[in-house]
Amino acid sequence: MDQSNAQAAALHIATYSGWYRFAARNGSWEKTHKALTFWKLTSLQVDPEDAGHVYVATEHSGLFVSRDGGSQWQRPKPNVPRLTTNALLALPGSILAGTWPAALYRARNGSAWQELDGVRLGATGGSFPPSPELSARVRFLAADNQTPRRLFAAIEVGGMLVSDDDGAHWSQVKEGLDDPDVHQILPSARHPGVVLAACGEGVYRSTDRGEHWQKITPAGARTFGSSVSEDGNGALYLGVALDRPNTWLRQERANAALFVSTDGGVKWQAAMEGVDGGIMALCPGIDSDGVFVSTSEGDVLQFNQAGARKIISGLPAITALALGA
């Protein structure tokens, strides 16, 4: 969800070792806060109705919440029932949390957590190829802005689940999406019916709200889809790497690239190439201009009409970022 507005003048960044806040000042980005450094953070969301209300998920300790832009953090009471939390989705009046083993929970306006049972049932049967002993997890959550009750859940590994009734019931996506290792999902806000999915073996596109899919991985050796986003002008972005993360410590690194499409995902052009770290998360830029690009090397780059430039470096590996207050 695009947080680029007058109140969203800070970048909130989740990493392998804590949360960071950077503020835009005089053309550069300055670190203003750091917290939760004992925790590996897996996801981050900013409340769409309050840019100072920030949620982060941790690998083993559930959620932390701040209502003042990160000055103070506390655990929700009660915390999410399964503390290995991998995915968050902040919606007006509610927060959804996806976990490992794969399950999905929702809390409305600070109330108790309710499990949305269809995700646990729909995610059965998946296993993670590099480590088959690991069961499936909810990797990513997304909402269709054009169809508010339609939700998407990426299961790693187990494919994609879709709900058309605000999470009460879920069904598996099967038509054309033949990669069960789904990392991120983007329902376009500007292109009716278009949905993108970044997967372990490539990138997929749907033009009918996720009912049918076609593989659209840009030509070249990069096949590992890691991230997808859309700016306020409707440009679509995807991050792809040469291979899976367990290869990124080799001499050639991730050799990642950022691709952009201005026609709803029909044609793609390379915007950045040769990025050392994998492009783990993207978020829309300020004033609808381009995107922020975060990497597994702890860098944040800004890409817009002026080109690409590194604005933050030296952080732990980044897992998520969002604009907020």
Each language-model region and where it sits:
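Extracellular glycan-interacting surfaces
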Residues: 1-325
